[in-house]
Each structure stands twice: as structure tokens, then as C-alpha cells.
Amino acid sequence: LLITAMIGLRVPTARLPAERTTATADTAHSSSIGSRAMRAADVAAGAIADVDVAVAVLDRVTGDVVGNGQATGPMFSASLAKVVVAVDVLDRRRSDALPLSASDVELIRRALGPSDDSAMNDLWTRFDGMGAVGRVATRLGLTDTAAPIEPDIWGWMTTTASDATRLLAYVAEMPPPDADVIIGALAQAPPVAADGFAQDFGLQAPGIRDVTAAKQGWMRWRTDTAYLHSAGFVGADRRFVVAVLGRHTFPDPDWQTLRRSVTMAATAAVGVLRGRIGSPGAGQLAVPNVHLPGVVAHLH
């Protein structure tokens, strides 16, 4: 998603976490596995200067969400917006009898796995993407998720790491036919996206085990700010949801620094969670990550 900024449009920036249900590094219980994973990710990300990394971990067994100091700070969503639209369309098919053809479902799969922007453009236009953001945010209690200020640019939807974990946790609880569409597409995401961008970073980085499905996102704002996000499920039972949202502001683009920071945070979090994840069971996804060598190509 190539972004050309509108003059005078305010860019979302990190802010101190508001009072809400997400526990921060200072308030999370020290024995919580999610808290330990979040802290490890925060420390790993902090090893690289000048990169803002928001980290949140949700435990679907306890319902706890823990995040670092930036976990409730809004950032541009980039392609994480595709999950929101997919949830809305499938929910409306089930609750409102929204007509949905097999080709429409294939659009959802293409928008999620290969992260095909043309498929998302069709979904956004035909199925009221702007309204989808509000409907899903209200239904799921995503209080820090908002529709884009420019209606035609879905990547300008704003969200947070904490809200991203809640969104994916909801996906895991959807009826199997709907959950399978979303999670199945994410689990089969290729290492190189439809636009040629290498998706093998964060939770999809080579060598990271036990990530069953993840959505990646990337975009560039003006000439000096890049966003790189990775959010997904850890464990065959999908007990944990991890979201790592990264932002790097720089005079000259340095995508490798941002990729390294997001990947280090994701690797650290998964490493801590590995001891608590379930083994594959009947009907559960256990898709290994398969990656091809690649470098950053363009912006998404």
C-alpha cells in the first residue's frame, strides 16, 4: 500500500496507555506467562534505537491482555484492516443473510493470505469498508480502532496492538466455517505477498516455530515513516494471540532495521510462550512456516 500523505493530515503517534483492561508492564502480574512474553518482546525491541514497537499478548484461556507502554497507542493499520473487513462480511452473511458468492469468499482469502490489495479494494468498495470498521469496533469493544480519515485509503484505519489481539481472538471464536476462511487463509500466507513484498518477518520469520497463522501489514507514510505489523496465533490450540506493531521514522528509509526490530520482538514473545502451548489436535491448524529468501521490495 503506497501512501502519499495529504498535507495537514495528522499522523497517529504513540501515546501513554489509557486506563483500560490492558495490563502494562508495570501492572501485569509477574507470574503471568503473557506478561513474561510481552516483557521479553519489549526488551528485545528496545535493543534497536529509534524504532517504536507496540507489543500485546492475549491469553484466550484466562482472557488477559497485557501490553507494553505503546500497546494502546494508535498506529496506521496497513493490511490489518483486511481482517476487520473479513470479519464484518462473514458476520453479516451469518446474521443478516448478506449475499456472498464463492468468488467473494475467494476475494477474502486473497486479501488475507497473499495480502492482495486489489482484492481488498473490491471488498472495501462493495461491502462498505468504512462502515465495517465501525461495526466491528463497536461489536468487539475495540475502543482504539477507527475508520480512516480518508475513506478511500483503507490502510489509514488506525488500531493498536491491544485491539489487534482482541480482533484475532474474536476470529478464533467465530463459527468454524467462518473462522476457517480467515485462519486458513492466514495459515497459508506465502512468504512473498501479491505485490512482491517479503512477508517473512515478525511472526512469519524463518525459524519461528509454533505460529499457526499470522497477518502481516506494511506501509509507508510520506517519505520518512514506515509501518510494519505482525499479529497472529501461537500454538496449535491458538491459546495465545500476539501482536507486534512497528513504526520507524527516519531521514532515509531503513526497512531492514524495522523488520529486525519487529522480528526480534516476535521471536522473544514466542520463545516464552512455547512452554505453554498445546499440541496439535483434531481439526486444529498446525501449518509449518515455509519461507523463501527475500528482501523488502515495495510498500504495502
Tell where the protein language model's regions lie, with residue ranges:
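Hydrophobic membrane-insertion alpha-helices, especially the h-region
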Residues: 1-8
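Penicillin-recognizing serine hydrolase domain
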Residues: 12-54, 58-60, 125-300
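Active-site SXXK
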Residues: 63, 74-98, 111, 242
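Amphipathic coiled-coil signal-relay and dimerization helices
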Residues: 63-70, 212
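Flexible glycine/proline-enriched surface loops and loop-helix/loop-strand junctions
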Residues: 67-71, 105, 114-119, 148-152, ...
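Hydrophobic alpha-helical segments that drive targeting, anchoring, or assembly
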Residues: 67-86, 104, 122-123, 154
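Short alpha-helical patches at coil-to-helix transitions and adjacent helical residues
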Residues: 80-83, 113, 117, 158-165
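Conserved catalytic neighborhood of penicillin-recognizing serine enzymes
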Residues: 93-143, 160
